[in-house]
Amino acid sequence: MSTTFKLDTSTSRANPTPAPMKRLTVPKIRARKKDGKTEEPLVMLTAYTARQAQLLDAHCDLLLVGDSLGQVIYGLPSTIPVTLRMMADHAAAVVRGSYHSVVVVDMPFGSYEQSPQQAFESASFLLKESGAAAVKLEGGEAMAETVAFLNQRGIPVMGHVGLTPQAVNVLGGYAARGRNDAEADKIVTDAKALDDAGAFAIVIEGVLEPIAVAATEAVRAPTIGIGASAQCDGQVLVTEDMLGMFERVPRFVKKYGDIAETIEATAKTYAEEVRARSFPGPEQLYQPK
């Protein structure tokens, strides 16, 4: 049983763009922030498959192949078990399904923390295997040397500060960060260190809003918020959360749909028709002429 994927650029409800657009580039994303401001916020969503990328692409500036796929796709308890091979394969699918957005792929836990050289080997593997344009890694000041090392060797890097899911065991959970002066100062310092190291954009996740605003104002690179502030230079959500695939979602998620209910209702109707032998009907069958 198989379905052939083909990039469909026809105008339809599922494919609203009449013709392919030229793909954005990392420098163009970086240049969206001028004089400390981004006139139109950047839009980023996660994508893990070619078809998902095709549906999201025309509406986004960036598609993030997030290590959140560990939980969303594979049912893992956290992002910790995600492998480079998983990330490379899903990123390749997203690149094939898109033509406009900058595709960024997460570097999974354990693939970059040991040294800049390890990070280069992992990042170059991801980009060569997938065709993605950039990588994203978690960590602030401690990762600045690695970000600079990658940048100097032709690998664009998106940073990630604040609540960093790969460090959940150290942080002790997914609570918002920046609730005391030390945490708040560290978030801003981390963002500035990544900015100075050459990160082309910085995700700020799960921090108190005033801290997100302060970090955004402190850096030249665009910031992309998730549970941060509307004053960030862009926003990102996990697509499945935004679509309503899961009943329980973080506080910072707004559900723009209830696709889970639609899927369940559709599957129920299909099952009922199969059991009643009303599917397949005459219009789905081949008859001799």
UniProtKB/Swiss-Prot annotation:
Gene3D superfamilies: Phosphoenolpyruvate-binding domains. Its main location: cytoplasm. One of its GO terms (biological process) is pantothenate biosynthetic process. Pfam families: Pantoate_transf. It catalyses: 3-methyl-2-oxobutanoate + (6R)-5,10-methylene-5,6,7,8-tetrahydrofolate + H2O = 2-dehydropantoate + (6S)-5,6,7,8-tetrahydrofolate. It is found in: Cytoplasm. 3-methyl-2-oxobutanoate binds at residues 67-68, 106, 136. GO terms for molecular function: 3-methyl-2-oxobutanoate hydroxymethyltransferase activity; magnesium ion binding. Its cofactor is Mg(2+). Belongs to the PanB family. HAMAP family: PanB. Catalyzes the reversible reaction in which hydroxymethyl group from 5,10-methylenetetrahydrofolate is transferred onto alpha-ketoisovalerate to form ketopantoate. Homodecamer; pentamer of dimers. This is 3-methyl-2-oxobutanoate hydroxymethyltransferase.
